[in-house]
Amino acid sequence: MLFRSEPGEFLLGQAYKNQYDGNFLGDIPPELGNNASYGAFRILQQDVASFETLLDTTSQRFGLDRELVAAKLMGRWRNGVPLTLSPDTPDYKLSEGQINAFDYADSPSNPTYYDDHTGLRCPIGSHIRRMNPRSGMVMGQPYSRRLIRRAMPYGPEYRHGHDDPTVERGLIGYFICGDLEMQYEFMVGTWGNLDYSQAGIRGTRDPIFGAQPEQQGRFVIRINDTRDPIVLSDLPRWVTTRGSVYCLLPGIGGLRYLA
């Protein structure tokens, strides 16, 4: 199952069921705004050494494979295979088109999906599940918050136990959408850093990029239906914004208008 996106999720002036009930350009002249996009350009420093160290300590403390801990925090294995399709191993053959074709619950149209409403396979608080609940409702409405991400790492690749952990490294790139406030800012602010009412993740933030309180971030991992959940209660902040600018990315017509 692939989730269909409306053109207006990424292109201004195109159809999109949002809070404006359709096409929306704001105060931008249509000659400039039609088929343009907004882009949040971000420089995100990542504390990779701290992340890898937490995997070590959590693995030793709870007897879990460190790569499974990493996958639970993210919602995917490092090779991109989602936990909801392969909860026990990253060695799961998927085509490029299948790697994002999944949901967290079954439905009449997709009865074969595993019903993971409790987060047994993919934790409810994991990064990819918080940032894209897929068929789940948003504030009671099926509004999408999808983004187009175009980014690249900066700094040297980190080799755990061999490299200087103080060397700065991270991610630099664009998060592209048709509505910065209701898509990008909503995802980062509400889904990423505000409290959810759902059981098991109350009082938590996104484990990967959330602005955690000082060494007090909390994350819940369910192993099975008989074992008590594992609670990580000392997550640090791993991602820090070093630079940010909101941009308008005109379409071809907009570039002609500016010329």
Task: Go through the PLM ranges and name each one.
Residues 1-259:
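Long, histidine/aromatic-enriched segments associated with O2/redox biology
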